[in-house]
Amino acid sequence: DVCEFRRVLEKSACLLLSEKGVPADERRQFEEILATMESADEKTLPALDRDFHTMLLRATGNSLMVTVLDAIAEVYQKWIDIVIRKTGKDEKNRLQAYHKGIYTSLAEADTDLALRFVDDHYDLIEEMLEL
């Protein structure tokens, strides 16, 4: 249920960002997070993952979205910790590609592609949770 909710919330954020555009400050922060994620280990990756998804919602300018995310963060973070522990190099690379794809698609105003990357991301998360 939480994964499904997060998927819908983030797709809504993508739709808003496609209309409004990604603000310059948030672009820089996205790029910093993504660059740091490339060399992250399993101890630092969960926090960076949370930072990325929080930034996605924060960039919309909709404080209620961030508040809702914070409310479910503890439950979801436990799942992400499990996923990260189960993640091999291939899955880590795929997750990184999906994060980068979400941001790049939004920066280029390609809404459909951003939504596909969100779906791909959560499909992989759900697959990893089933293992």
Predicted regions mapped to residue ranges:
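Short, solvent-exposed positions on alpha-helices
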Residues: 24-28, 43, 47, 63-67, ...
